[in-house]
Amino acid sequence: MANKYDNIPLNVILDNIKDKDIFANTAEVICSMRETVTFSKFFYIPANCFRDMNYVIAAINYIITPFGYKASWNWLHDVDVSGNYCIHLFLDEI
């Protein structure tokens, strides 16, 4: 499923990610999902990184889409643990 971030140039996407660690951490989780054939996973992110997630997923999709996969995410409402939000990451074959 396409979203408004899919057609933004990669350099613009990367410039909009304030916390580069969340990008690296999310990419690591996505990679582990493929290795273990797990296509969804819960993942905790700092509350201040919430705004970055659309850009993080768009950047990851630039890398994995040519290999037949697409990542997405969904926020789990009202799940806040010590200032971290729980999100649900998805990895779909396309």
Segments from the language model and where they lie:
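An N-terminal amphipathic alpha-helical segment
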Residues: M1-F50
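Acidic, low-complexity, intrinsically disordered interaction modules
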Residues: C31-F90
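Short acidic DE-rich linear segments
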Residues: E93-I94
